[in-house]
């Protein structure tokens, strides 16, 4: 795929007033989500749930793409239409999570490094044939006593850049996600410092690996205090700190930035995004790539009556998409 085609896909992913829905939960994560609402974790239930999300009527009004898990990209609707084909026909770009998870980084207690580079070229080639047009790789950066170390940041951004270069070689837009974890008692200034250092290192690594930024999307953490911090920040403080951090680290040529919700409540994730989009002008679109913050209300409703509440749960998904789509324009009223 040419640079022009990659850039076109990346721009479509951050189209005005639209975001990405993340439904790429691993087998272990979806098992926990199902267990929390009493749904049996079997393949048919997972397929049916993904169908509920992806076939929500008029979803493409506010959703430009969806990140799938390996199992999901191979599944089909009840009518037998492969999910990627259904998505493409309904204006939603298929994406695929390709990392293999975060594991302890040897020599660095309390720190993690993401694995999955081995065999990635062949997997990306297959995913492209299955219909994927973008991919996602998540790095995990913990904040604690004397962490993250420079070694941890370097190891993770190097892997992100190698992944991104391989994606572009195979015609997929890389979504790079260096998640600064909310767990801990760190304050907002510590979150800012770590996020800034991580993003600075990431874009240096992308440059060194010849990654074309015009065909790349950043999935970023908001600059937010740790969940156990005694002094929580206001919506405006989070928005201002996040925008300032991004402006100091992210090149303006990037097509756009989408945020992860990272354990925020539904209302927080929408309010923070809306507040950030009050800042004008911004060098790039700021939108969303939410998982839990898009799904949890619908999942709870569906679990109460999987047949009877199917359409009602889809309406909840649509409403959450609409709220976040408005927030991506700075027009959410709460």
UniProtKB/Swiss-Prot annotation:
InterPro entries: Aldolase_I_AS (IPR029768), Aldolase_TIM (IPR013785), FBA_I (IPR000741)
Top-rank taxon: Bacteria
tRNA-binding in keyword set: no
Keywords: Glycolysis, Lyase
SUPFAM superfamilies linked to this entry: Aldolase
GO molecular function, one term: fructose-bisphosphate aldolase activity
Listed name of the protein: Probable fructose-bisphosphate aldolase class 1
